[in-house]
Amino acid sequence: CGYMIITALDSRNQFALRWRDEYGRQEQFVNYIDFPPYFYILTGSTQYPVAEIKERGAKFKIAISYFEDGSIDLEGRKLTKVTWLPAKPRYIRTLRVLWDETFEADVPFHYRYAVDMLEEIPEYDMVKWYWDLEWQQGGEHDGAITCISLTTNNGNEAYAWFPDIKDNPERVFHVNNITVFNSEREMLVRFIRDLNNQDPDMLISWFGSKFDLPKLIERLHANGLDPRALSPYRDVKGVYFDEEIKLSKAVGNYNPVEQPVRGRILLNLDLAFERQWNDSQRGMLPSMALDYVAEIVLGENKLVSEKFPDKNEFFARGWLEDTETYLNYALRDTELLKRIDDENHTSEAMLSLQRLLIAPFDACFYASNMGSIYFMRKATWKAPTGKKGERKSYQGAMIYNPKTEGTNGLHENVAAFDFASLYPSMMIARNISWETKSNEPTEFAVNILTPRDFSKIEGEDYLYYKTD
């Protein structure tokens, strides 16, 4: 059996595996003791019986065990497997420095589990939430979340609060699908309750890991609520208990592919869409702002307040002074997110790649991660642990003055092309290399804008040169 959501719960020393089937939500737990972390050293290397660990101001020793499982490195040298007790993955950072050469000691533990234990990841219909926050900028309620908007397969809705809603209920009379609260805290309590009741598999946002998620965690904490409630396992990176709930610097420094809310998949749609766009050779987008992308892809624009056309003024004053536009603006944002995703199959493409690789979701964004998963699964040898190279400075090239040195100077009517990746195919397709240049035009079967546009050619004077 395979699993779609693969989560390492270091606080519990367990893997959590979550999926859905015809009976609803399913999950399974695997204790680290039943699948302990490991790496390799060269056979014949010193075998230390114990190692000293320093953690949270304390020192203690852990027991190290060694096994021969027939593994070799790329050069055919025999390797010895290293494991330890307690079986905590984070101890690997201390252990691997005991030897000059180690192998696969830099593999994330959930990658390791997927490679060793999973044979497939079955397809199922995920519950997806497209979400966005608005928060107050300036004034008495500076920094407070004012509105949380959602779009799901069942429609869209928004949570909002107003300090004067009891006295001015008419401010939301003309806005559909809105639930109103008297305080930010009440709104957040309801949002967390609905999140846990509906239990979405995937939370999809635009730059969410950089802005929205840290803000949500910060405001939950500021309102005396435990941000760990965002996770079905009450485990959120950067949120910990030390006499009280505290936040570490990790909360404001999530990278766009990591999964800080354990048990849910977080997708930054901006990153996935940008990679999809670039990989299809459409050229580099000048802006990744949601309004720009929505206009390019959907021909749609975000709402603009007639009362406060300046964005900064709108975000500072729109909440209380142009409420209807403010709430509709928030709802429209998540509608645009879902449409961009649906019309480009962006999240489904990422999930398909995950099923193809049989890997955790966060391994499916960069070639280095995908390559490591593939080679660990297919290779008959173990790769050396990666080492950070030494940074060295070097002298730049000398540029000669063509007038005094008699070298070649300016050439007129010369064009320079710079395409990202796939150079051979593009040189031939665009007929721009002197080695393969052709003067024989060839008709296109489809519009040259492919893969963006598969329509028939109508009135465009494109030339394509036969180079084969």
PLM feature spans:
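Charged, flexible boundary elements
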Residues: P86-I121, I373-E405
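Non-catalytic nucleic-acid-binding interfaces of large nucleic-acid enzymes and RNP effectors
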Residues: C1-P108, A222-V261, G299-A316, E324-E335, ...
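Residues immediately flanking
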Residues: W131-L133, L269, F417-F419
